[in-house]
A protein has these predicted regions:
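Polytopic alpha-helical membrane-helix bundles and their juxtamembrane interface segments
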Residues: 23-106, 119-266
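N-terminal secretory/membrane targeting signals
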Residues: 1-29
Length: 266
């Protein structure tokens, strides 16, 4: 049994490593990657891509430690960091070889990973109570409004301030749902203490951690700085926000999953 578990884990790591190597080679094939020592934005892309890889392996391997009802949540956490890691390989290539902001790759990443993060709220509540599907769809609607608004502004399809306002409205809608809406009420009424604690921490990440993204948008597009300074500020702020929000979300899910699993064994 032990050898089977070890073999399974090694297979996961091996498969992930092979896929990662292929992705890295494909990203590097589009240009010669030369990372300069004073390119702090490029350095942040490399550091964060590696942190996301490590997080992915961790979340997938830790699935064996938790009960069945938490495995899906940990799998989603691993998928979030996996998808982000793959996109970061391409984004860092775009930045290092061209010096331009990888807007399209970043928003493709967000259009996949941010809805997955919102699904985590639904999954963590579904593990302990019956949750109406309306909660899921309201979180998805808020997420799409937020992301589409941001993209239309950054891609030049809409006035920057108008797009900023639309994105902020989507974010506010999400905050309402997790602080005062049905998701918040289910958490307060039916969740055990450990789940309530995790839910509360997750929603403060969405409040404080996600507030970093509007700062990146503001310093990247709305301050009137030089194109170089604006691009540097935008990408460093976005990169740090991605690291904090995606990895921290997964670690919170992992902590409550392990805690609830161990409590059930006693």
């Amino acid at each position: 049994m032990i050898f089977s578990s070890i073999k399974s884990k090694l297979a996961v790591v091996s498969t992930f490593g092979t896929s990662l190597a292929l992705t890295t080679n494909q990203a590097a094939a589009s240009g010669t990657l030369v990372l300069k020592p004073d390119d702090f934005v490029g350095i942040s892309f490399w550091l964060i891509s590696m942190a996301l890889v490590a997080s992915t392996v961790f979340f997938f391997l830790e699935r064996d430690r938790v009960s069945a009802k938490w495995k899906t949540s940990l799998t989603v956490s691993g998928l979030v960091t996996l998808v982000a890691a793959v996109h970061y390989f391409y984004m860092r290539d775009v930045w290092v070889t061209t010096g331009s902001t990888p807007t399209v790759f970043r928003y493709i990443d967000w259009l996949i990973t941010v809805p997955l993060l919102m699904i985590e709220f639904y999954l963590i509540l579904s593990a302990i109570a019956k949750v109406p599907t309306g909660v899921f769809w309201r979180l998805m609607i808020g997420t799409l409004i937020m992301l589409v608004g941001g993209y239309l502004g950054e891609a030049g399809y809409m006035n920057l301030w108008l797009a900023f306002g639309i994105g902020m409205a989507g974010w506010a809608y999400i905050l309402y749902e997790i602080f005062a809406g049905e998701a918040s009420k289910i958490n307060a009424q039916k969740a055990p203490a450990s789940v309530q604690s995790a839910f509360n921490t997750m929603r403060w990440i969405v409040t404080i951690g996600w507030a970093i993204y509007p700062l990146g948008y503001f310093f990247g597009y709305l301050t009137g700085s030089s194109p170089t300074n604006s691009a540097n500020a935008l990408n460093i702020i976005y990169n740090l926000a991605d690291l904090l929000n995606k990895v921290a979300f997964g670690l919170i899910i992992w902590q409550v999953a392990v805690s609830e699993t161990e409590s059930a064994k006693k």
